[in-house]
Amino acid sequence: MKNDVCFVSRNRQNRLPIGGQLPLFLLLLNRSFQAPH
């Protein structure tokens, strides 16, 4: 799962400015922590 988050965050970083990428990344982290595996 951590690799997934890392990969997605890198992809978003390439496309969007940090300001647009950070909230999405945090939301993704929150979801991965709260979601039952």
From Swiss-Prot:
It comes from the Bacteria. Keywords: Leader peptide, Pyrimidine biosynthesis. This is pyr operon leader peptide. GO terms for biological process: pyrimidine nucleotide biosynthetic process. The gene is pyrL.
